[in-house]
Amino acid sequence: PDMYLRPDLDTFAILPWRPQQGKVARLLCDIYCPDGTPHERSPRYILKKTAREAKKEGYTCLVDPECEFFLFHTDDNGVPTTVTHEKAGYLDVSPVDLGENARRDIVLNLEDMGIEVESSHHETAPAQHEVDFKYGEVRTIADRIMSFKMTVRTIAKRHGLHATFMPKPRAEVNGSGMHIHFSLFKDGRNVFVNPGNPQELSEEAYYFVGGRSEER
């Protein structure tokens, strides 16, 4: 074989939307080469390696994402469209928010899988929604984002809808993004904070911002 998939047992979860008889579980895997070494281009391996190196220096990175997506209709043949009949906007609720039941179902299924959800709401554009996770260790949250996307698509389909995470599926309305809040801790202290600075930002925080700007 070219590669091996090695299951990460910490990611085991029962899929709550599947029949309870003959239950179906989800496991995420790490990619390994035939010689038993991790595949160095695997995004999951790169993230785990980076987190390990940070931990050696005493740092723990915590993140919480704001995951945005659209829920559109499908046509008579089940083909996805960018059509919606709702006119809801930011923080609207039912009956204006026609996707509220689907979003609620998504959140309940995520929680049944052990994924902690902090909040959910309708976003700015019609048919646009947001689900926010509770903060957690960076690799755990990355894994949860992958499970989140699978869950959203699955539950949306059960409601007769099509979910898309495209940044800009419709030109005339707001697009979707994924804001990610970062914090870096050492010895239980948020190292990005410096109360003595006018902006209350530490030297590490400025280095972090500079590094992110350089990557862009």
Regions found by a protein language model. Give the residues of each.
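Glycine-rich, acidic/polar active-site loops that bind/position phosphate-bearing ligands
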Residues: 1-214
